[in-house]
Amino acid sequence: MGPDDVLLVHAGSGAVGQAAVQFAVAWGATVIATASPSRHAQLRELGAIPVAYGDGLLERVRDAAPSDVTVVFDGAGTDEAIEVSLALVADRDRIGTIVRGPDAASFGIRAFSGGSPVPLTDEEQAWRAEALPKTIELLASGDFVIELGPELPLAEAARAHELVEAHVAGKIVLVP
């Protein structure tokens, strides 16, 4: 992925989606990210063009994109996300999901973790290894951020799970 790419990130305001946005922006790609309107300002701060998910998503993405979408990262796993992805990108090797792993082969797309029945290839393992030092470098420079949510004592772990299930923004931190 690079400056000639337009990446669509489904669930761009989630933790993994935010990471995908930041990496793609660092590599020079144009990024369009789906999220609820309440999260659009945050996506703009990360360098993405936000679009609301829901009815009409395909048209909104096409309207927002400066050129054709060339790559898709699916962190949502919804039927809408898959359908829009398949409509936008002909090269199925450039569509990846972390959520619909068991279904990926039936769509002809890539699965990364997320229940994929296929282990990571050597190339994919190399990508992960290559990403770690780059991530540390970006974190150290302040060019990569991880959104933190509430900090709770370990004794409130059950409450932390409730917050995760309620989709509270940011990573919840449990402390001893």
Roles of regions detected by a PLM:
Residues M1-P176:
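Terminal helix/beta-alpha structural elements that buttress the NAD(P)+-binding lobe
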